[in-house]
């Protein structure tokens, strides 16, 4: 009888562990979650009019090893927001190569990647890379937590 109780407890623990993962997967796909997570980590608030057009999230374990690749589109240039958050227009080839690698790794469609001809502005804070592409009016955000 004791063995049955122990097995039942172990099964319940495993069920709860996977149920948490499944419920978390639904929440992590929302624009509100993506924006909130970026703000929590960096202090940078993504403008409310930015529309999330692509999102990838993967948590590799319950120990918080995860990555997020989100793309937001704007209707017009968020000039004030870019200046307020100190985005740089100096070229950062290392950041660009890193984002290209990550985009390839997670299977990001071509239209949501940085093109080698694109001008861009960038910001890097607390393990979060942000690249704004003016000619596409889009912001690419890559979060990696280890």
What spans do the regions from the language model cover?
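Extracytoplasmic electrostatic interaction patches
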Residues: 86-146
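Alpha-helical transmembrane segments
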Residues: 13-17
